[in-house]
Structures are given as C-alpha cells and as structure tokens.
C-alpha cells in the first residue's frame, strides 16, 4: 500500500523542528526594536512672537482694533504705497486717455511710450512743459502734442512717470554700456560722476535699495533745480480797481508828486 506523503513535513524526522530552532537562534543576535513613546517631548527652542498682545496697541472700548495675524502677514510692495506715485487706476486712466486722443492701438502705444520715456529722461516732467515732444524715426524727427500727455496725467505727470523709473534706469545703464552718456537733466545739474548717470532724471523713484551716495545725488539734483523757484499762491487780480479819489494838489515847487515844498530846502540826496 502506498504511503501518504505530507509535503509540509521534512522527509527526515524532526527536520521541521530543527529549522524552527535555527531561526530562533539567528534572531537572538538581533536587538529588539525600541518602542517610541508618543508622549515624550524633546528640548524645543522657544520661538518669540514678533507682535504680542502685551504691546501698547490701539484699543476701543477694551477691544484691540488690529488683527495681529493679518498684520504679521501683511508685507506689500513698498513702492505701491508711495503717495509720490500715481495709483494703478490713475495710471490706467492716463494711458487710456492718451490712447483715445492720439487715436492709437495698444501696439502703437507701446511704440509711443518708449520714446516718450526717453524724452522725459532728457527734458524732465515739469508741469510747465508745453508744445510738442519729439521722437526719432531714423534721422527724421516726428512731433507729437504734449497736451494729451499732461492734461490726462492725474495727479501730476511726474507721479505718472514714476511707474517708468526702473525702465528708465535700465535704459540709461544700457546707453552707458555702449558709450559715454549723461542725460540732459544731469548735465544741467552739473553732475560730474558718470557712475551716477543712472539716477540723473527727475522722475527717479528713491526706494530701500537706493544707495546712500545715490540718494545724496538725487537730493542735490532736486535742490539745485528748485533753488531759484518761487511759487506765489495768488497772482494779480485784474478785477480789482482803485475807487478812491486822489485830491492832492501839487505845484512845480513841490519836491515830488508825493511830497510838498520844503520852504526852500532841496530834495534830500
């Protein structure tokens, strides 16, 4: 009779037990993994809050009026907050107004904005400018009226042109790289250092990245430009007339029209 062979048992008696013992002996040499205690704490470095509620903060009826979480995350672009720069909405209104009066497309306006920025670098952005501005088409001068540029600029043309400050600075650097170049604004201010040519335009926007020497140069340029300027609040009122009657009577012997005779004395020398 054929014997029934179990495939799970070693052919030799006791073979399966021996394998189990060998596996146990091989595991004795290994260290048991340590369990990690989820409740344990390391020596963490304390972090201080940048703005705490213990500061003297503005309060109304015992409630703080600031949202500290929002204040910590509020880090806007500094130049966007300057009141010396036109807002984005004011700049867009100026752009659309100029485009409508010149009757140009957006692509054509892109060509116009380049030479107008260069013209302002050379001639400034004074509110008193009038007439025409000029761009070059090869060797030919092409004239455009300044009226749309100035009248649509709110609050002022200089505040509008502050949006072009970085582009103008990069343009001057490009011109200086190809040869000696100093904007006319710098020539009028007698700026002698060619390395400061990139700051020699009147709509340069001073920011946190501007070096101390450059800020000094910009301040000196503005002071020199405004040294002889006098602004009068009121001009001559042409609607005011003298209504009083002058009843003074003078003779030929009087000293002058405002002084009677001095009884033989001559006029004071």
Swiss-Prot record:
Pfam families: Poty_coat (PF00767). Residues 9-36 have a biased composition (Basic and acidic residues). Genome polyprotein of potyviruses undergoes post-translational proteolytic processing by the main proteinase NIa-pro resulting in the production of at least ten individual proteins. The P1 proteinase and the HC-pro cleave only their respective C-termini autocatalytically. 6K1 is essential for proper proteolytic separation of P3 from CI. InterPro entries: Poty_coat. Keywords: Capsid protein, Virion. Residues 1-45 are annotated as: Disordered. The keyword Transcription regulation does not apply. One of its GO terms (cellular component) is viral capsid. The keyword Glycoprotein does not apply. Belongs to the potyviridae genome polyprotein family. This is Genome polyprotein. It comes from Passionfruit woodiness virus (strain Mild) (PWV).
């Amino acid at each position: 009779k054929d014997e029934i062979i179990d495939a799970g048992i070693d052919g030799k008696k006791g073979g399966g037990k021996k394998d189990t013992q060998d596996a146990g002996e091989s595991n004795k040499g290994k260290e048991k993994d340590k369990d990690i205690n989820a409740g344990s704490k390391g020596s963490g470095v304390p972090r201080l809050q940048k703005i705490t509620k213990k500061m003297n903060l503005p309060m109304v009826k015992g409630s703080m009026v600031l949202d500290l979480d929002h204040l910590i995350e509020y880090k806007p672009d500094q130049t966007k907050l300057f009141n010396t720069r036109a807002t984005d909405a004011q700049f867009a209104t100026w752009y659309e107004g100029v485009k409508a009066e010149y009757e140009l497309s957006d692509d054509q306006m892109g060509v116009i904005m380049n030479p107008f920025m260069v013209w302002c670098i050379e001639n400034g952005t004074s509110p008193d400018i009038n007439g025409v501005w000029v761009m070059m088409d090869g060797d030919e001068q092409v004239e455009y009226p300044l009226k749309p540029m100035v009248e649509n600029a709110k609050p002022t043309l200089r505040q509008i042109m502050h949006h072009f400050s970085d582009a103008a600075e990069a343009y001057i650097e490009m011109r200086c790289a190809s040869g000696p170049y100093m904007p006319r604004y710098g020539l009028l201010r007698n700026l002698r250092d060619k390395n400061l040519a990139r700051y020699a335009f009147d709509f340069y926007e001073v920011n946190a990245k501007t070096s101390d020497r450059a800020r000094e140069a910009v301040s000196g340029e503005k002071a020199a430009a405004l040294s002889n300027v006098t602004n009068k609040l009121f001009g001559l009122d042409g609607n005011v007339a003298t209504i009083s009657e002058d009843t003074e009577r003078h003779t030929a012997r009087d000293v002058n029209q405002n002084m009677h005779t001095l009884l033989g004395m001559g006029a004071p020398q």
